[in-house]
Amino acid sequence: MGALPASSHALITAPLRGEDEIRDNAAFEAILWALSRPGDVRNLPKPGPRTILLALIDRECRVHADDPVIAGLAAQTGATLAPLHEACHVFLQLDPGADTARLATLKTGSALYPDEGATVVTEARLGEGQRLRLSGPGIETTREIAVTGLPQGFFALRNDLCRYPLGFDLFIADGSKVMGLPRSTRIEVL
């Protein structure tokens, strides 16, 4: 088969990116950077877990969401809605009085497949409240952060469940801000 005539090259153009694709790519970049630099706060193009969902979820994902609106949006992507203990992507509504016992059923992977640990997304206030000291990959020495709006004992339970390489990755959304805490991050409650 011969080469295309030189004049036909001008007919081939790249598709234009739509507003949704631009938003989802910007959100993906923000959450990627947030997870690679634990404790850093990144800006999302639009507020809330909805933006994170649209950047991460597709039809190959198993999703659990406490909020029916988020669950409906996940279903629209073609993702499979799953119970908490089977979901790879978990969108939780955790208010300060919530019972954390159910979090013990989150997928944390196995020695053979640690990558099967869940990705958890929740909302809380960043920059105020309970002080935490972070250490581990992506942090030069240590880093102190503050988070409020999560149940008492949440980070203690998270530490029990996250024994690297096992565990779950956590995104905390606060309006249009997001912070990532990967399973490899050690969290000391101050």
Regions found by a protein language model. Name each.
Residues 1-62, 66-69, 75, 176, ...:
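N-terminal, charge-rich interaction modules
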